[in-house]
């Protein structure tokens, strides 16, 4: 009897040891979310949060299906639209073990986080911010973007303006932007591309977001009856700028084009309809007819809650790439994950999609390089780790809703 008990105990102990060993071999990954819950781009926070959660849940399911020993969880923090708060948020997520950080949406926040936290620790950042100012720092290969940078968005805005006006040649575009890196860089790139096409530029008119009113700037923007307005702003300040433009009595929103920070599914109630109805704009596009998008959208609709928002597919892709890189590295070490991003986005390697994510995980687990194509499309990272793909939506606000008119390749 005692011998039987000892045998049973030994067997149980052996099973426990085997279980612990198997558990120890599993890569436990933490993906951090730097969310704009409050601040000038708070409209983006809920959809980014949801996108990363869905990516983590789906990747975990596919890893289990593939028999690959990796599981992930997501943790989040509010960056508050402020670089100092963003650094504190990033530190808290890294302290919780985050190997990758998805977000933030504002470039000065990303720069502060990189300089203050992530470069030293080799933690990968996947920001939603598009400003080229991000590439003025030496990030040691730790900052990847799945969103097209503003060097490409400027070309998209030019194409959208030509689509509206028929030509750029001789046409006057009045450029007005919020005084911060996103506005400054995009205005500069647009102006250069517009004049290269034979167009003329008025301004740019620059405004401080802390101003109480923008009547003076609005008057400057509408002077000389321009053929088009190029407005680069955030929702909180456009509520005031838009009202000031309407007060001039000269502003026609159907002549205006905006960039991605003013792209939202439903127009916020504090923006006057007369300031936005009929306005067009550009944002990074997602090919909605693909099987990958159908899976993504099905997950989104099943989860309920917030509607799709600009760049939610890009945040989903960022989390998926972090997961794949960790699987390829067989490690959640931030440096190892960072070093394997290009191993899962290798041009010329076998292509995998969201529809074949389980197979992709098997491939990287066996040491193969792959070219993962995201929901938002291919990445084909340049030397500076920005995507070279350039699909953009051209949209128009109709009865308070964003309606996509067409999709374009900004480089053509």
Task: Name these PLM-found stretches.
Residues 2-9, 24-412:
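Extracytosolic ligand-binding ectodomains
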Residues 7-17:
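Hydrophobic helical h-region of N-terminal Sec-dependent signal peptides
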Residues 17-24:
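Sec/Tat signal peptide C-region and signal peptidase I cleavage site
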